[in-house]
Amino acid sequence: MARTTPLERVRNIGIAAHIDAGKTTTTERILFYSGVVHKIGEVHEGTTVTDWMEQERERGITITAAAISTSWRDHQINIIDTPGHVDFTIEVERSMRVLDGVIAVFCSVGGVQPQSETVWRQADRYSVPRIVFVNKMDRTGANFYKVHDQIRDRLRANAVPIQLPIGAEDQFKGIVDLVRMRAKIYKDDLGKEIEDTEIPAEMTELAQEYRTKLIEAVAETDDALMEKYFEGEELTEEEIRAALRKGTIAGTIVPMLCGSAFKNKGVQLLLDAVVDYLPAPIDIPAIKGRLPDGTEVERAADDDQPLAALAFKIMSDPYGRLTFVRVYSGVLKKGSYVLNATKGKKERISRLIVLKADERIEVDELRAGDLGAALGLKETFTGDTLCDESSPVILESLYIPEPVISVAVEPKTKQDMEKLSKALQALSEEDPTFRVSVDPETNQTVIAGMGELHLEILVDRMQREYKVEANIGQPQVAYRETIRKPVRAEGKFIRQSGGKGQYGHVVIEVEPAEPGTGFEFVSKIVGGVVPKEYIPPAEQGMKEACESGILAGYPVIDLKVTLVDGSYHEVDSSEMAFKIAGSIAIKEAVMKANPVLLEPMMKVEVEVPEEFLGTVMGDLIARRGQIEGQTVENGIAKVTAKVPLERMFGYATDIRSNTQGRGIFSMEFSHYEEVPRNVAEAIIAKNKGNA
């Protein structure tokens, strides 16, 4: 089957922003103007297309990255609407991994918010080109120029306005197009009747000033244009657009647009900018992967190359288990067998679908550059690579942050117990930052996630979708343990008691690894002193032992283990014996290697009226917080701090009472840090007391 849309006319884009910047409304308007939906949905009415979960429609926030296809000017645009709440960082992270470009939506009143910085950093991590849409220009306090300065100062981005607003707040009535040097005046409520006219006289000077800045920015992308500019020649519209596209894709320019999605202003011009400036799959560097022997390879966006696709999301659905994939090269066909190279398992694609709003359309194939969902995959999870069996490759997976908060879940009846295990399995398949474990001491089921809202929504889904009745415990901090010095240790497991004995023996070197590494294992066994079939069980034994540390029973992370020596017995050695030997060795090593307790530190941003600044800072310091910065602007003080999560429970209530209900704060996970000795001793004593 031939490709219906040429690859250069495909755009895979995300819409990302701070919560409440108007992201979902912007997506709805894009779908309305491009003809996918015929009635505009409103977030505050709970009728939007991309917010499909009940919790999303009730709370007016987008939780899961919904993927939708539409078209504009003969281009196919695949859109992922990402959540703006910090507890759903994984949704933003996984969508950034499979996108080619991003529309970053900012509120013209709020400007650059803490979550905007997080989303921007995630886009930086994957080098995703972006354009900025300054939304809500009709709101009281709207200021396009303030947002422009904040993006340049706080995000260190080369934001270049290609539009200016005509009027603001309730006087916002149109847009100056700096590329064409024309004005667009909106004549009706639906924003479909637009008058193309001269720039208003009172704005010509300002428009000229920003036009010059635009020309200077694009001239820097190309020596020939720079020469033309210095010689005083006018650049043509085509030259400006081509240079803007080149700069945007290279990440050296971020075009800025403005509008009011809710009032239907500026959305068609935003769609034009997506087509004009954001990259097609062939405009971005080829995806990198590894062959089974570790060699690095590239796969270009080309239907004729071998298949390489990344699973970026799992969703349970009336249809069955949907695995969302991005095809980077080759063609994924319905009914075909593919290799999950990450797991080394063969899988069958029973059906393929693409989403158009909340309609699912079955297709026979997905080609290079396409986004869609596959049914029938049983072993494939987020971050896994699907490829041709004859040409295996493993693509770089996603960055999955450690959960920071946990609660115990107790089913109310035996029937609930069965429903709970089914619900937890499905939810953890969908969301890799949601972890489930069973406490070996208490036999309690413990769920962990990225924040209180994250767990609240997951518990809500268990109750609604899976009809589980359960008691939920108090939130607990997800502490971790690690080591501080390199050591050598050995583990021997020998049993002789008549008949076949047991024999396993390993020698390991253990050293601290980079934060975020988790557990890293390397074998340097030579000459078969430990047969290769016994190395994976030994590694497994070590991994399992690290799930419960020696200080307080928390998982041990960020260590590198090298298997350097060992011995075996022709008759008595077995996989189980080496698994136990591995476990003994790692426990001895951790005990000798200066183990320490780690706690999650949160990046906290607080905004309060200036008169409460002293109270709020004193309170943060009392919570073991480290103040990192403070600013005061228009009577509003902003404080940035790093604070242990353990001291942030109930902060929402405290800040309200400390500021007469006028303070707001946001919090996201920053990193794990060593717990001060006096605090650590209390935690360890408490855990040993419970054991």
Swiss-Prot record:
Family membership: Belongs to the TRAFAC class translation factor GTPase superfamily. Classic translation factor GTPase family. EF-G/EF-2 subfamily.
SUPFAM superfamilies listed in its UniProt record: EF-G C-terminal domain-like (SSF54980), P-loop containing nucleoside triphosphate hydrolases (SSF52540), Ribosomal protein S5 domain 2-like (SSF54211), Translation proteins (SSF50447)
Subcellular location: Cytoplasm
GO MF term set: GTP binding; GTPase activity; translation elongation factor activity
GO cellular component: cytoplasm
Positions annotated to bind GTP: 17-24, 81-85, 135-138
UniProt source species: Thermosynechococcus vestitus (strain NIES-2133 / IAM M-273 / BP-1)
Designated name of the protein: Elongation factor G
Record domain tr-type G: where: 8-282
Keyword field: Cytoplasm, Elongation factor, GTP-binding, Nucleotide-binding, Protein biosynthesis
Cross-referenced HAMAP family: EF_G_EF_2_B
One GO term of the biological process aspect: ribosome disassembly
Record function comment: Catalyzes the GTP-dependent ribosomal translocation step during translation elongation. During this step, the ribosome changes from the pre-translocational (PRE) to the post-translocational (POST) state as the newly formed A-site-bound peptidyl-tRNA and P-site-bound deacylated tRNA move to the P and E sites, respectively. Catalyzes the coordinated movement of the two tRNA molecules, the mRNA and conformational changes in the ribosome.
Entry-linked InterPro entries: EFG_II, EFG_III, EFG_III/V, EFG_IV, EFG_V, EFG_V-like, EFTu-like_2, G_TR_CS
One Pfam entry name: EFG_C
